[in-house]
Structures are given as C-alpha cells and as structure tokens.
C-alpha cells in the first residue's frame, strides 16, 4: 500500500504502542520464545500478526513467529486465502485441517448456538499442535472489548468475576496463552483492518446466528460508550485495580479474622462540625 495518511499513521503507532505495553506489562514474550500466532482470518488476528511482526523487528529480544490457521472444514471456507497471504508475507505458517464442523453440527441442534463447542474443539486442537511444534507461547487476537464483554458475560450468566487474562497458563500446564491486543480497542482494530485491506474470512458458523449472549452484552457496552465515552476503558482499568477487601470472596480476603486493631490511635471526630 502507499504512504499512510496522518490519521492512519497515528492509528498504527497507537496500536503498536499499546500492544508493546501489554507485552511488556505481562511479560508475554521472552527471549528465545517461539510464538504461535493463531489466525482465524478475522480483523483481530490479522492485526495481531501485523503488530507482532513489527515488534519482532524492533524488540530488544529475539523470538520466532509461526502463523497457524485451523481449517475446520466449514462449507465454503476459502482455503486459498490465508496461504496466499502468508506466503506473500514470507513467514512460516501451518494450516491445521480438522473437521470439527461435522462434530458441531451433529451435536448441536439446528438453531442453537454453536460458538462454545466450536471454540472448545478448536482450542484443544491448537493446544496439541502448539505442543507438537514446540511453541512456547500461543497468541490469540482478543482485544480490550472482548475482555470487558467476557467480564460481564461471566457476571451475568455464571455468577463469577472473571474475564480473559492477558496471559494465561492453560489447564494442561503445557501451553501459555497470550493476548497482545489486550490494551487495544475494537474500533481502532476495525479501522486498521479497513485501511490495511486484510483479506477477511467470515465465520459462517457463529457469525450468522442472532441474539447470542455476547452480542447482547456488546450492544449494551456500545450503548454505554455512546452515552458516556470512555466507560469501557474505565471498566477495563477496574480489572487491573482489584481490591479484595471491598468485595465478598472469602478465598481472596480473610474476613473471619478481621477485628478491631487495638494498637490503632484513637481518632477524635468533631460531630459539631460535620
């Protein structure tokens, strides 16, 4: 593509800076790492790969990048798109072929949400492949808005305070998942994808289903953001500023042992001047 406009240049610098800060803050990538970048063909994973390739050039450490896409044998999946794009970039890549589509269609009744099962099957396959190629980190393209949405989904439907951590050791103990776009917002990623003209591959399984719980939460947050700009960022910051003593989880704070501090100095309160 040609020379970037002033706004495009600012956007690119902002995404690179925020991704770099997230990588540094959470020690996502270390010297000698082999980072498996999971590509779905969507705007988020393309942007993540683009940003990580830049960081690889400028970072004070050395690390490998291996791009991996999983062909789940969805009808109409354009198999040629990602190989052509990745060959042009000149980076190592693998296409993992596994027919999870048939499994999902067999197990999930028509009209029901397939996202959860599809995601679990894909994740398990990618964990196994990461182990096979000796990847030390597995990079996913989730961004700030995904993290906040997940926080509310868990609160509303699971009764738990958890989201998507920027860095996570998988349950198998053999994979470390990183989310380099954790500080980046979806609006910026969409704008970046538009001007970079990434060859987007739509998700035919889950993208066509209406009224998913995540979509409802997304629309709620978008409505809040329209009414009060900056609210999503404030919510995200709250996930980095947890105060266990002000919540009600007895596993995080010892409420049972909480007593008056007999050594504390007395404090005189002038009730007249209150």
From Swiss-Prot:
The cofactors it requires, by name, are: Mg(2+); [4Fe-4S] cluster
Q: Known InterPro entries for this protein?
A: Rossmann-like_a/b/a_fold (IPR014729), TilS/TtcA_N (IPR011063), tRNA_Cyd_32_2_STrfase (IPR012089), tRNA_thiolation_TtcA_Ctu1 (IPR035107)
Motif PP-loop motif: residue span? 40-45
Note how many cofactor molecules are bound and how.
Binds 1 [4Fe-4S] cluster per subunit. The cluster is chelated by three Cys residues, the fourth Fe has a free coordination site that may bind a sulfur atom transferred from the persulfide of IscS.
Q: How does it assemble?
A: Homodimer.
Q: Which NCBIfam families match?
A: PRK10696.1
State any further remark: The thiolation reaction likely consists of two steps: a first activation step by ATP to form an adenylated intermediate of the target base of tRNA, and a second nucleophilic substitution step of the sulfur (S) atom supplied by the hydrosulfide attached to the Fe-S cluster.
The identity of this protein, by name, is: tRNA-cytidine(32) 2-sulfurtransferase
Species the sequence originates in? Pseudomonas fluorescens (strain Pf0-1)
